Design a protein with these regions (language model features):
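Short, conserved structural patches
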Residues: 2-5, 54, 58-153
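Alpha-helical assembly-interface signal, strongest on the long, hydrophobic N-terminal helix that forms
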Residues: 2-78
Length: 153
């Protein structure tokens, strides 16, 4: 019976230790979750500009489309995806690339930039006195082989 009394006393001395452990670990977990959410939004923006660049390159690779047409397609795609503004995309419809075989081909190249302003760690950054605001320039490039204009017979 003496052993039972000692274990009860030891258990009584450990009361509240779970709360202290939770108080130590919870802020770290919240920071991790906030970072996952913030970087998820950043990745979504990156995927959007990548797809916009691909749409632009697809149109730029076709004959009879102007740079303004391509830039309009990119702007429409980004607006439909919830992103607006940003610098004018770079479009080069007369670029060339050399294949490993030595053959030179005509390609259309499109580069899209987007300033991704975001709040790092959401409102949690304010709790520790940080502003939590920052911005980075996302960039996506798409290159597609240019199609030749059909010749009339």
């Amino acid at each position: 019976m003496a052993g039972m009394k000692g274990s009860r006393k030891a258990r009584r001395n450990e009361r509240g230790s779970e709360l202290i452990e939770l108080a130590i670990v919870l802020p770290i977990l919240l920071l991790c979750f906030a970072a996952i959410i913030d970087f998820g939004f950043l990745f979504q923006r990156y995927e959007t500009i990548t797809n916009a660049a691909r749409e632009g390159a697809r149109l730029a690779s076709l004959p009879n489309y102007t740079v303004a047409d391509v830039q309009g397609r990119i702007a429409n795609y980004m607006a439909a995806s919830g992103l607006s503004g940003g610098p004018t995309p770079y479009v080069n419809q007369t670029a060339t690339r050399t294949l490993p075989s030595g053959q030179t081909i005509s390609v259309a190249e499109v580069v899209v930039w987007y300033p991704a302003g975001m709040t790092y760690l959401g409102p949690i950054a304010g709790l520790v006195g940080a502003s939590g605001h920052g911005s980075m320039m996302l960039r996506a490039t798409s290159i597609m082989r240019a199609e030749a204009a059909a010749s009339g017979s």
